[in-house]
Amino acid sequence: MAVATSAVVNGGYLIKPSLTKLGDDKRYENQIFSEETSEIMRYLLSQVVAKGTAKEAFNKDADKAYTEDGKFKYLVGGKTGTSHKIDKKSYTREKLTTFISVLPIHKPKYVVLISLDDPKGINREYGEPYNTWNWSDAGWNAARVSRQIIDRVSPILDIKARYIPNENMLINTSL
């Protein structure tokens, strides 16, 4: 999933996973779609965090997620996923929640994949904007865990997970 997401956001190139740093000539394999498609996908993934299913994790529970003038500061994109598990014959009541995040979304460098096996819901802790999956969907838990990890590793990795977008941003908001 991380390799596929990397291709979606890096200009369409499949990347060979490695635990050590490789030269660019050894990292990139095939280009499977265009830079333009990748830019559109980066914009869409940023909207999951800004306005979509991961919004609650990245703004309501975040320390200073907005600037004083109300502009969104997280430079993260991602995708939530919630599903019922399946046994031999049917779906069960147990769930699997996943959030894959990319940062910084304008020039992707890192992918964080969080997958939680049958998480417990956060019951009304954040008000009641919606009650999907009894407060145990990926936007309520896996995305929140991802945000907490991003908050902690961003200073260590010397990346700006939070910043104020400007006109020079690659993402075209007029789509």
What are the functions of these language-model segments?
Residues 1-30, 36, 45, 53-158:
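Active-site beta-strand/loop architecture of penicillin-binding DD-peptidases
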Residues 30-32, 171-172:
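Extended, non-catalytic substrate-recognition/exosite surfaces adjacent to catalytic cores, especially
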Residues 50:
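Betabetaalpha-Me/HNH-type nuclease active-site subdomain
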